[in-house]
Regions:
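Outer-membrane beta-barrel proteins and related beta-barrel translocases across Gram-negative bacteria
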Residues: 1-335
Length: 335
């Protein structure tokens, strides 16, 4: 989609989103995208009330980006370059550059040790004229095969090593001391006990979950970040962009009601999930909004209900550990 206008005095703008599918066969996915946002006047959108699919008259930030994505079964490669412009700033500090931004990932499978995911991200970020960060981050994520005991417990391990190499200048959150190398790690053990109750038209699955997680060392201060805890990231090794340090235990449960159909056809009718994080001690480096800075986090959960052929409704929530305050809730429907 593109839109462009021009009036007397060379007041004009151009916005464009272009996508190119570069696939030659079904064994991989390859595409190139281009985003262009330009205007000749900082107040042009507001003065002329420009409102289109691509433009909002209240826009004060422009983004220009070129991105290439490639992926196949066990690997991916993303290469991007971006330039951001803040129209409210009159000096060269209005520009921010992220060039390059390269992400690469590869999965290795072994019968004996499970899977290893290698992910690497290299980027250079320059903003406010003389502030910059150049970094190379490498992650190795280990996921051994799950083990089912005779009593029905499903046990699994998961671990991650992260190597961070960066050089920063005049940034607030990073050390300004030449090239810095850091190593972080985390290991987690999860156990669940799925139980099934069969009925005529429905069957229920109830699964209590337990996870213990430990990450040594010290993490970066994220106290000012806007991060929330939800059930989607409850059992994640790192619930933020950083690996949270310390010892913690996670308790939760999953309950599902599945409707039987003809043959092997079935549909999930209802699902309920709840969970909470118990930290060994308070973590002042975590944002208070996430509740992960406390010994007991919020109780987070998710409820999904399917209305036969009509659609479904999803409800996500977060309740303070004293069960008096509802800190977050979101309702979404799909028809």
């Amino acid at each position: 989609n593109t839109s462009a206008t021009k009036t007397a005095g060379s007041r004009n703008h151009i916005f464009a989103n272009l996508d190119f599918n570069l696939n030659r066969d079904e064994s991989y996915e390859s595409n190139l995208s281009l985003k262009v946002q330009r205007t000749s006047n900082d107040t042009y959108f507001r003065n002329h009330s420009i409102n289109t699919i691509l433009v909002d008259s209240e826009d004060t930030n422009l983004e220009n980006e070129i991105k290439y994505n490639f992926s196949k079964n066990d690997m991916f490669l993303n290469i991007a370059g971006s330039v951001y412009e803040d129209l409210r700033v009159t000096t060269n500090s209005r520009y921010e550059y992220i060039v390059p931004n390269i992400m690469f990932g590869k999965t290795f499978f072994t019968e004996k040790f499970g899977s290893f995911d290698f992910q690497s991200n290299a980027l250079h970020n320059n903003y406010q004229t003389n502030k910059y960060k150049t970094s190379l981050t490498n992650d190795v994520i280990w996921r051994p095969s799950s083990h089912i005991t005779k009593k029905g417990f499903v046990n699994s391990l998961e671990g991650m090593l992260r190597n961070i190499n960066y050089k920063a200048r005049k940034t607030n959150e990073l050390k300004d001391a030449g090239t810095v190398n850091e190593m972080h790690g985390v290991l987690a053990y999860k156990s669940s006990l799925p139980m099934k109750k069969d009925g005529i038209n429905y069957y229920n699955i109830f699964s209590p979950n337990f996870m213990v997680r430990y990450a040594p060392g010290h993490m970066k201060n994220l106290r000012g970040k806007n991060i929330i805890l939800n059930y989607t990231n409850l059992y994640s090794l790192n619930k933020t962009s950083e690996i949270e340090d310390g010892l913690s235990t996670i308790l939760g449960l999953d309950f599902k009601v599945n409707q039987k159909g003809t043959g092997e056809v079935e549909r999930e009718k209802l699902s309920l999930s709840l969970g909470q994080v118990f930290n060994h001690k308070e973590n002042n480096d975590m944002p208070s909004k996430s509740s992960l800075d406390q010994k007991m986090s919020d109780v987070v959960g998710e409820i999904n209900y399917n209305f036969s052929e009509i659609g479904k409704i999803d409800y996500k929530f977060s309740v303070d550990h004293n069960f008096n305050d509802l800190n977050y809730n979101e309702i979404s429907t799909e028809l």
